[in-house]
Amino acid sequence: MNILVNFADEKYKQVRSINSWTGIHVAGMDLVKEYTPEDIDSSFKNDNVNIFKYKRGCGLWLWKPYFINKVINENKDGDYIFYCDSGGFFIRNPKALYEYLTDEQPLFVCDIPLLESCFTKPECFKIMGCDTDNIK
């Protein structure tokens, strides 16, 4: 089974519908798991209240590994789980990527051609002792 996972709050609900539609009709996904902030377990929210208090990323994107892990645990070996941000959409079927997945290497991660400094505040680099050009 090919499963698409996405997440949206009310602000991104409409654009997520494009993600889900292209997931089914372009990417050939068998199932789309659409999650919202209301789908996060209250005990998980309570355990991480200091993170979920931030509006940015609906709790600094902590929901992302939460839902991916949830889908992994709910499905069986051999299923393909594809996470795509709700603002993204499919222009072709990603099945060609599946050939890179093996039992030894079950994950395929894409990167974007940007530097970490495009996403990280300079103070974070200083705090971590990583404020050199070769790391940023």
Language model: regions and residue ranges:
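Glycosyltransferase catalytic domains, chiefly GT-A lineage
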Residues: M1-K136
